[in-house]
From Swiss-Prot:
This is Urease accessory protein UreD. UreD, UreF and UreG form a complex that acts as a GTP-hydrolysis-dependent molecular chaperone, activating the urease apoprotein by helping to assemble the nickel containing metallocenter of UreC. The UreE protein probably delivers the nickel. The lineage of its organism: Bacteria, Pseudomonadati, Bacteroidota, Cytophagia, Cytophagales. Coiled coil: none annotated. GO terms for cellular component: cytoplasm. It comes from Cytophaga hutchinsonii (strain ATCC 33406 / DSM 1761 / CIP 103989 / NBRC 15051 / NCIMB 9469 / D465). It holds the Pfam family UreD. It comes from the Bacteria. It is found in: Cytoplasm. Belongs to the UreD family. Its main location: cytoplasm. Required for maturation of urease via the functional incorporation of the urease nickel metallocenter. GO terms for molecular function: nickel cation binding. Keywords: Chaperone, Cytoplasm, Nickel insertion.
């Protein structure tokens, strides 16, 4: 039997200078915990069963009203479990970032297990002077158990619009049975990747602050001129100013541990009082 797709809703508004959840309707398999963090709102995603079980479907609409400050993270890696009957696990998140609002979407990696099928769609709309930071993070299975690119299919899509105009449309599909993931044109010996998108007017103070930190971290972790090629292969990345509204980082690595320091340093920067005012990864190992 195909599971019904039930539409979940989150609304975040500013009340007396503080961002709070003012409306929610959440259905299985999704769980969301709301944490109070000074003037910002911190929402933590989780799942019943610790991940996506065959056929699970999440359809979530997020409305972050004007002047709100919100962070979305996860309890742990998002695991996609084995599909015994060829059913797809699917996640669709449609979000609005209101005027002068800030949203930081910073979850842990998606980890597709052997024989799993996963499809993800992230759609965000930005209003005037809104800022959005999105992290899209992936690891190719239970690497420590020797499982690597053993899933059946993985698809992810991110689309961002600003004032009704698309400024990001990023799509990526992996089908290991049809493609050689160890090819130099794919992952070679890497098993993890991370994409970071910063969207918002480049003249905004928040955008300048986050972009400066991203450039600093890119200079620290990525190298344009490599002397020792064997060392360079553990992590490869690039930082690109796409246009006046988008700054982007792409990075792949041999394993997730090599990407953790980059993300943790970025999360720590979010504790600036002009941004979130707290670290969404605080307390992590």
């Amino acid at each position: 039997m195909v599971k019904d797709t039930t539409h979940s809703i989150l609304e975040i508004s500013t009340i007396h200078g503080k961002s709070s959840v003012t409306g929610s309707k959440i259905f299985r398999p999704l769980k969301i915990f709301a944490l109070e963090k000074n003037k910002a709102c911190h929402l933590v995603f989780s799942n019943y069963g610790g991940g996506f079980v065959e056929g699970d479907s999440i359809d979530l609409t997020i409305d972050c009203k004007a002047d709100t400050v919100s962070a979305f993270s996860s309890q742990a890696n998002t695991r996609i479990y084995r599909s015994e009957h060829g059913k797809t696990c699917k996640q669709t998140i449609t979000g609005t970032v209101g005027e002068n609002a800030l949203v930081v979407f910073m979850g842990d990696p998606v980890v597709p297990h052997q024989k799993s099928i996963f499809e993800q769609h992230l759609f965000w709309k930005l209003e005037k002077n809104a800022v959005l930071l999105v992290i899209d993070w992936f690891e190719a299975g239970r690497i420590l158990n020797g499982e690597r690119f053993a899933f059946d299919s993985f698809f992810t899509e991110l689309k961002i619009e600003s004032n009704g105009v698309p400024i990001v449309w990023d799509r990526f599909k992996m089908d290991p049975s049809q493609n050689n993931m160890n090819s130099p044109g794919a992952f070679l010996d890497h098993s993890s990747y991370i994409n970071i998108f910063l969207a918002g007017d480049e003249n905004l103070t928040r955008v300048k602050s986050i972009e400066t930190q991203l450039r600093f971290l890119a200079a620290q972790y990525f190298h344009e001129h490599i002397e020792n090629k064997s060392e360079s292969l553990i992590r490869i990345g690039s930082a690109v100013k796409v246009n006046e509204q988008v700054f982007m980082i792409r990075c792949s690595a041999k394993n997730n541990d090599l990407l953790q320091p980059f993300v943790k340093a970025l999360a720590e920067h979010m504790s600036d009082k002009e941004l979130l005012g707290f670290n969404p990864f605080e307390g992590r190992n």
